[in-house]
Amino acid sequence: MKTFSAKPHEVRHEWFVVDATDKVLGRLAAAIAHRLRGKHKPIYTPHVDTGDYIVVINADKLRVTGNKAEDKKYYRHSGYPGGIYETTFKKMHERFPTRPLEKAVKGMLPKGPLGYAMIKKLKIYAGDTHPHAAQQPQPLEINA
């Protein structure tokens, strides 16, 4: 018996739409990262992008548990001495509703060229509409 290895041109990438209304941030991000990597498919190969496209709608209705809305901090740096900025989940979610989910999923994907290709297959929208109707995405229920 030979070991199977998927070839990039043989992989079929499907489109799915996920409704993030009242879903917990980390659990939803873990399920999305799993799908983006393609680990749910029997043809999963670590060095080939076997994942699907995921369209997330209603990202503005995402939630976190406990006191994380005030306690969870996001950091960025300007590159200058003393140029560190911090913001809470609540502030970031109000200003950029899609960014907390994007950062959570990105942190769960591999770092390097393959991970960068995987994150490009994630489309996140704050409202309940998206411009990907032509791809006919299938609804995907994630119990998170």
Swiss-Prot record:
Disulfide bonds: none annotated. It comes from Nitrosomonas europaea (strain ATCC 19718 / CIP 103999 / KCTC 2705 / NBRC 14298). This is Large ribosomal subunit protein uL13. GO terms for biological process: negative regulation of translation; translation. GO terms for molecular function: mRNA binding; structural constituent of ribosome. Pfam families: Ribosomal_L13. The keyword Ribonucleoprotein applies. Transmembrane segments: none annotated. It comes from the Bacteria. One of its GO terms (cellular component) is cytosolic large ribosomal subunit. Belongs to the universal ribosomal protein uL13 family. The gene is rplM. InterPro entries: Ribosomal_uL13, Ribosomal_uL13_bac-type, Ribosomal_uL13_sf. This protein is one of the early assembly proteins of the 50S ribosomal subunit, although it is not seen to bind rRNA by itself. It is important during the early stages of 50S assembly. The keyword Ribosomal protein applies. The lineage of its organism: Bacteria, Pseudomonadati, Pseudomonadota, Betaproteobacteria, Nitrosomonadales. Part of the 50S ribosomal subunit. Keywords: Ribonucleoprotein, Ribosomal protein.
